[in-house]
């Protein structure tokens, strides 16, 4: 095998993640094996844990801000700040990662055009962070439509209209014509 993946809804919240990663590194250290983590809350993937992962082949990793503005992250109870996001990306680049994926939602309750603009602003600022060593870095933006789920605070909220979803995506594509930024 060449890739070892840890799967869960919230891997970063697992209290024994660092010891688990140390054991996985010990077993796989001499092999060309990459360790993949699912989307991790910014701030949970700290520098000491990233140094452990760095010992084997690095792939990109994903951070899920879900919203570009702090206002909207507060609405959806996503308890991370822009500083958390920037610190995590900066640490990743300093430790040699080249590919960072950011996951955002389109059509969250109370979302405004300013919130969509904030995604573009954040991506452009993140793309200016310098990497250590050689090679170029890439910020990949994944932009998926919000779908209300049952038994959640937003279960009765309307889903974004397809025309508005497409408009938001096209806006971001126009705004993010920037070297080192990909959008899907």
Residue ranges with predicted function:
Residues 93, 116-184:
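Auxiliary Fe-S-binding modules of radical SAM enzymes
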Residues 1-101, 105-140:
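Conserved SAM/AdoMet-binding glycine-rich loop
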């Amino acid at each position: 095998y060449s890739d070892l993946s840890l799967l869960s809804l919230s891997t970063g919240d697992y209290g024994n993640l660092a010891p688990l990663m140390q054991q996985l590194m010990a077993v796989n250290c001499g092999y060309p094996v990459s360790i993949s983590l699912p989307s991790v809350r910014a701030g949970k993937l700290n520098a000491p844990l990233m140094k452990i992962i760095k010992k084997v082949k690095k792939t990109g990793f994903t951070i899920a801000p879900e919203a570009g503005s702090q206002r909207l992250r507060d609405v959806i109870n996503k308890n991370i700040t822009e500083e958390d996001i920037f610190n995590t990306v900066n640490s990743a680049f300093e430790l040699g990662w080249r590919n960072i994926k950011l996951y955002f939602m389109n059509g969250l309750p109370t979302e405004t055009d300013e919130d969509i603009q904030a995604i573009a602003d954040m991506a452009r600022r993140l793309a200016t962070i310098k990497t250590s060593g050689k090679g170029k870095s890439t910020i990949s933006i994944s932009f998926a439509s919000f779908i209300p789920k049952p038994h959640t605070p937003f279960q009765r909220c309307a889903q974004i209209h397809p025309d508005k979803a497409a408009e938001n995506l096209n806006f971001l594509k126009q705004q993010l014509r920037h070297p080192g930024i990909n959008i899907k």
